[in-house]
Regions:
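P-loop NTP-binding site
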Residues: 1-85, 89-239
Length: 239
């Protein structure tokens, strides 16, 4: 919901790239966290929490397939992972029509990543469809934000702060075509939504837009949502 959407809608669009496949990385621990387990306990066996967290994985799979991608789910393996829990995730992926492989590269090096490599090669051979972007550049800024919110995040509506409304008015008043730029939405990485406390696959929420910032040189509009701190662009040798 963050890296993939921006990669497709900004980088691939601007550089005419067509990915042959996309790897979706997950782990039993991450799924249990989305299933409501506190961080200190995510390494323990907990089938109920795993099942409760699966909607998050399914939401990402649906999103990637909507973009037209061949998807390979790569499960990062930990030494104490339970085989029955792994099998549940495997079956979920196969039922969703995507490939599945276990990645054990941390413990076994390259040999531990061979299964993932094989599945990726098979996916690449089959090939993805031409990218189906989340929005058209001809849409208004508000329409683009709403498209990403509904198609990728699972939200329903968008609200705008007074500062964001002023930002939009200023950008449009420039009358230089900046409304046609792609959007780069800044939000929490801990949820499909803007709220880090909303785990799993929340839906029907209202996305609160705080600011809309023109980055003319970079060629996109930054849309900040919720309480988010943007990543600083630092030089190779920060002061």
């Amino acid at each position: 919901d963050l890296g993939a959407e921006k990669f497709y809608d900004i980088k691939c669009r601007m550089n005419n790239l067509q990915p042959a496949a996309t790897i979706l990385v997950t782990s039993l621990r991450a799924l249990k966290w989305h299933g409501g387990v506190p961080l200190p306990e995510i390494g323990k066996e907990n089938m109920d929490a795993l099942i409760n967290g699966l909607p998050n994985l399914k939401a990402h799979i649906i999103s990637l397939k909507r973009f037209g991608q061949q998807v390979v789910v790569s499960l990062n393996h930990f030494a104490n992972d339970n085989e029955e829990e792994i099998d549940v995730v495997r079956k979920e992926c196969l039922a969703a029509g995507v490939r599945f492989a276990i990645s054990d590269g941390f413990a076994k090096g390259g040999e531990g990543a061979l299964d993932v490599a094989r599945e990726v090669m098979a996916a690449v051979k089959e090939g993805s469809k031409p990218l189906n972007y989340a929005y058209s550049l001809d849409e208004s800024i508000e329409e683009k934000i709403q498209d990403v919110n509904t198609k990728v995040y699972g939200g329903q509506d968008v609200s705008y702060s007074s500062a964001a409304l002023k930002d939009l008015a200023k950008i449009k008043a420039l009358n230089m075509g900046f409304e046609k730029l792609p959007i780069c939405i800044a939000k929490t990485p801990f949820s499909m939504s803007h709220d880090p406390d909303l785990k799993g696959a929340p839906h029907g929420f209202t996305l609160p837009v705080q600011r809309v910032i023109l980055n003319a040189g970079a060629g996109f509009l930054v849309v900040t949502t919720g309480a988010i701190m943007r990543m600083p662009g630092l030089p190779k040798k920060p002061a």
